[in-house]
Amino acid sequence: MELFSKILLVITLTTAFLSDTCAQERSIGTSWSFTGIGLTYDHLVKETAFVHVGAQLEMTETFIGRARIPGGSVSFTWNDILGSTTSRNGNRISFFTGAGAAAGYCKDFRVKRKEQVRYGSFFGLKGRAGVKIEYDRNINITAAVAPVLGMHLFKKEETVMMRYYRYGLLQTLMPELTISYRF
């Protein structure tokens, strides 16, 4: 977990101190979904794009009782705002999509009942698509899907095994809800 904290710190500091974006809008919050819970940081880079950085406890196996300890992951996506509108009461509604990367350490989904799945590292490309509502009281609520197309590495006996990251694909079906404070 110490490495996890250092990676998140480096990503956050790099994003926060980009020279062209220091005066832009930022938000920090929490995300919830069936796949896990986490902390998020969004940084508006320009009027039509924002950066999303997330650190998440991978809880799927924990929620269904197959693991005692959750895994962890970090992710980074560059999101383009496809369109936005303002409601009658001043709230801004934006539709976005983006791409980036994710990496972490967790237990992957098992397909067969007798299959043993071990903890291991994963990495891959991450997509993100959703809708963000920006309220006039500096609160954002975002609903998004964020699949990861990647690989899962784990040790089986004395061999390192690699296969596609199954939970990354299942995240397409499990939307996440994020509530954040904008400053």
Q: PLM features: residue spans?
A:
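Generic early N-terminus positional signal peaking at residue ~5-7
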Residues: S5-K6, I28
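Sec/Tat signal peptide C-region and signal peptidase I cleavage site
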Residues: L18-A23
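Short N-terminal segments immediately surrounding and downstream of signal-peptide cleavage
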Residues: E25-Y41
